[in-house]
Amino acid sequence: MEKTKQQSNKDIVLEAFDTLFNKRDYAKAERFWSPKYVQHSAHIEPGREGLFNLVKSIPATLKYESSLIVAEGDFVILHGRFSGIGLPVNWIAVDIVRMENGILVEHWDVIQDEATKKQSKSKLPMFGSSFPVYAKLENTIG
C-alpha cells in the first residue's frame, strides 16, 4: 500500500526530530530542515542554524519523545516531551511544522513545564500515563 502524503510527512518529521534531538547527527539533520527554515518560536534564534545551535547548547542528556502526531495538508503537529534539557523540569511541547517537498520549512511551538502530580489540578499527567518525579523539586513546589 502506498503511503499518503500526510503519512510520509509524519514519518519524515519523526525521523528529523529523532535525528536532531536524540541522535544529534547535525550533518544528517541538515537534509530534513530547509536552509531557509522559518522559525516562529520565541525560544529559538532564526533559521536552521538557530535551531541547531540551540540543540548544541543543551546537555547531551536531551531526549525527545512524541506521544501524538497529526498531519493535515502540508502541516504536521506533534505533542511531545523534551527531557534532560538542563532545567529542573521537562518541557511539554506542541510543535507545528510546515512541510514542502518532504522538507521542514517553517515551525511554531507552544511549550510549558511538565507538572508533577502534586502540581496538577486535574491529577492527570500531561504526557504519557505517568507523572515525572523531580527529586529536587517535589517537596518544594506547591
Where are these regions (language model features)?
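C-terminal and inter-domain tail/linker signature
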Residues: 1-142
